[in-house]
């Protein structure tokens, strides 16, 4: 595995690249306030001889550059994804988008359909239920919180049903936490993800479905966001997507929105799909 910063016109993007230099490029696109550790479990399931795996911190997250007000939104992130593929010399590539990353993946597919070989949409496609805003906004507010220590934060979250299995989430949080006055807080600050959320509220993601002309795997979390905050993909939207996107297949996983990307079952299904 190689860690590096790739310099794009928009700024520096922190990346980790693993697998074979001659393998098919697969790019993992994280969620709203997430970082490159989001794809540890999924990438472990992918054959390192067949795939070149790129995980990255989106602009304004983790160790990537903050690009300032008015520079976020799905098209900006999609442009970065395409630029990353360009820098790695990949004429075609696969995409795995989790949560916000799924909508960004669809924008990439809309922008350069001839370059996108396969797409995995991980628990996002249409409009989430309104109740989802409660835990999502709480997570954004937490980004400004200072905790007494790294151990104190880990003790608060390690037993929450959002963050299971714990080991990959511990790595994600360990990557994200930094020392500040009086304790620890997060590398990722609220402005970038908040601007992306405000952008989402203005969009109709259903209009992006027509851009999916390549094989697509839609992975739906069958469990509500704990304790009862609903679904990012409703049952109705899941069925509608499979009707309206002829190139798509779907799978439902016994997980919630936060655990699905760390699920062994989801990872295996994704690996089988991308090996085709």
Which residue stretches match the model-derived regions?
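Catalytic histidine-centered segment of alpha/beta-hydrolase-like enzymes
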Residues: 251, 255-264
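Gly/Ala-rich beta-loop-alpha elbow adjacent to hydrolase catalytic centers
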Residues: 97, 101, 105
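Flexible "cap/lid" loop of the alpha/beta hydrolase fold
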Residues: 106-110, 117-148
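Active-site loop/oxyanion-hole signature of alpha/beta-hydrolase fold enzymes
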Residues: 43, 54-96
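Conserved alpha/beta-hydrolase catalytic His-Asp/Glu region
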Residues: 148-200
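Alpha/beta-hydrolase fold catalytic core
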Residues: 1-26, 48-51, 90, 239-240, ...
């Amino acid at each position: 595995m190689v860690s590096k910063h790739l310099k794009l016109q928009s700024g520096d993007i922190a990346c980790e690249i693993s697998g074979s230099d001659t393998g098919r490029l697969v790019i993992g696109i994280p969620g709203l306030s997430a970082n490159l550790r989001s794809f540890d479990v999924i990438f472990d399931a992918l054959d390192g001889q067949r795939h070149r795996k790129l995980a990255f911190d989106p602009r304004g997250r983790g160790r990537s550059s903050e690009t300032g007000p008015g520079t976020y939104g799905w098209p900006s992130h999609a442009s970065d994804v395409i630029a990353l593929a360009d820098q790695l010399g990949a004429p075609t590539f696969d995409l795995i988008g989790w949560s916000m990353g799924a909508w960004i993946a669809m924008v990439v597919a809309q922008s350069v359909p001839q370059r996108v070989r396969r797409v995995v949409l991980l628990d996002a496609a249409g409009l989430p239920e309104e109740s989802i805003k409660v835990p999502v906004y709480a997570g954004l507010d937490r980004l400004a919180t200072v905790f007494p220590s790294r151990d104190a934060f880990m003790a608060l979250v390690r037993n929450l049903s959002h963050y299971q299995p714990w080991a990959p989430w511990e790595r994600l949080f360990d990557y994200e936490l930094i020392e500040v006055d009086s304790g620890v807080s997060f590398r990722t600050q609220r402005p970038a993800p908040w601007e992306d959320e405000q952008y989402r509220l203005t969009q109709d993601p259903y209009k992006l479905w027509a851009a999916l002309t390549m094989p697509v795997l839609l992975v739906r979390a069958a469990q509500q966001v704990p304790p009862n905050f609903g679904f990012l993909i409703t049952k109705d939207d899941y069925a509608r997507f499979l009707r309206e996107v002829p190139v798509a297949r779907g799978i439902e996983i016994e997980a919630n929105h936060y655990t699905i990307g760390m699920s062994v079952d989801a990872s295996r299904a994704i690996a089988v799909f991308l090996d085709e």
